Amino acid sequence: YDQYTNQPVTGIQSIDNKLYYFDANGVQQDATFGIDVSKYQSNIDWEQVKTAGVKFVIVRIGYRGYGSGALVLDPMFEQHFTNARNAGLKVGVYFFSQAVNENEAREEAQGCAYVLNGRKLDYPIYFDTEASGGSNGRADGLGVEDRTKCAIAFCEEVKAQGYQPGVYASTLWFRKRIDLNRLKSYSIWNA
């Protein structure tokens, strides 16, 4: 119960610096907490993350440039990957895609496999599809069919490279910008 309102707490709550999840009735539920990190989170106290109850980390491995289309390694990838592992956390990765066709999506997946170089993952390699910062990214104008084809091409290439594939998007994108029904054979990460 909330100490101020005396009402049941719901959702994710931090109690004594530990994370807990409560359903709509205030009943504590089993939950596994994870975080995603990239260059935007540069100073992470990994022991504090673990102590807070986080069990896994999805690290951004890279992205494709909004305008140029160049593949870019996230400058914090190696540090985040290594430090999360050293803290005893399970790890997966995601790639922020701006692929505009299936060949580019496969290229992104191949780039992930190249950087990982055989390293084992506990969670998938996720195809991250979302709008660019100013909605001026090269893939922002893709229709549902083309975006779905890109996601499938990425995931199939990830499988061919020996890794588990997944797709990461918001609820809105899974409803309106990509065909979720065609992605059911892949891990789904809903943001």
Residue ranges of model-derived segments:
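Hydrophobic faces of well-ordered beta-strands that scaffold small-molecule active sites
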Residues: 33-37, 55-59, 89-95, 125-127, ...
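Acidic (Asp/Glu)-rich catalytic clusters
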Residues: 44-53, 75-89, 112-121
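Extracellular adhesion/carbohydrate-binding repeat motifs centered on closely spaced tryptophans
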Residues: 1-32
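Solvent-exposed loop/turn segments at secondary-structure junctions
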Residues: 39-42, 56, 62-67, 97-102, ...
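Surface-exposed substrate-engagement region within the catalytic domains
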Residues: 114-125, 129-191
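Glycine-rich anion/phosphate-binding loops
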Residues: 73-76, 99-113
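Boundary/entry segment of secreted carbohydrate-active catalytic domains
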Residues: 28-64
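Conserved, mostly hydrophobic/aromatic
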Residues: 35, 49, 84, 127, ...
